[in-house]
């Protein structure tokens, strides 16, 4: 394995397996946002602390000696994980008329800690960000509000109150914040007049009413006979990004699919070689999800222990002793409509829809399914989710 996108996908699945243990219903998060924030900590970490971060994020498989390079700032060599992040974030944050995509990271550090200039220069270069000097010791509540306000501004006010009351104390020293915002319109929009109330079955015994969008069109599609499921790619305008949907054949088939799913299988199933353009009768519910995660215990369970306690070696960040990561909170929001994802009321693009083609396949998302949003050029998964309860 040599690419950051592959490492990100592997970490995404490790995280998903942890979330599955405690969350039976909806799941939604941004793996690339979390890894980029932790990458900034890795840039200032050394020895065991750096090795633990690298191993959990699968960065140790991206290039050799990543941790050593990170600690000494010798990170210009092409292929190095931080260098790859620099290219990736530049690619993501390019302005385009087709969609809005913005990834923003920030570290908020207790102002009594003096951060090294080399570190500040490096995170600016590779992660397009800075350390914000923050008075946690004397003004924890004001600090909390300041962080929340920054997150709101970076996510078009979709993510509010990332840090609830009481989550920032005067013993806080370092807070990682990652924010990602995406708004895209479908390449082929759903016609609103085709949206009807239909049943969605969370399980075989109960159903809930949803607004089910529908369109007949040509999509990249594949049957996954070995796991009794099918996969469909729904492109966004410009086709730089897509939503990929994994749908079990049976109403209660999601658990079996999740158990068999791996990063390697996902990449294989959704490759251009495996999928073919097919006429599909697509039924997709209109939905909105907002999910929050406190990742500290999850990351510790996965093996990232030192950064959260007195053993943290963040001497590449500061000469001061006692610095450790206090919080890693993550919140993600998605809204899927006829227009697209988190679509604004912009001028409509007229799309010529196929006039009732002879449908080869039906893809009816009326029971729990998995979905993810992918940047196709870099094969990077921006968001990953499970929709199982409207």
Swiss-Prot record:
UniProt entry tagged with the keyword Acetylation: yes
Compartments, record wording: Cytoplasm
Keyword tags: Acetylation, Cytoplasm, Protease inhibitor, Serine protease inhibitor
GO BP field: negative regulation of peptidase activity; protection from natural killer cell mediated cytotoxicity; regulation of proteolysis
GO MF entry, a single one: enzyme binding
Entry-linked InterPro entries: Serpin_CS, Serpin_dom, Serpin_fam, Serpin_sf, Serpin_sf_1, Serpin_sf_2
GO cellular component terms attached to this protein's record: cytosol; extracellular space; plasma membrane
Protein name: Serpin B4
Main location: cytoplasm
Entries under Pfam families matching the protein: Serpin (PF00079)
List of residues that carry N-acetylmethionine: 1
UniProt record similarity statement: Belongs to the serpin family. Ov-serpin subfamily.
Described purpose of this protein according to its UniProt entry: May act as a protease inhibitor to modulate the host immune response against tumor cells.
Summary of the tissues where the protein is detected: Squamous cells.
Keyword presence, Cytoplasm: yes
Site keyed Reactive bond: positions: 354-355
Gene: SERPINB4
Entry superkingdom: Eukaryota
Lineage start: Eukaryota, Metazoa, Chordata, Craniata, Vertebrata
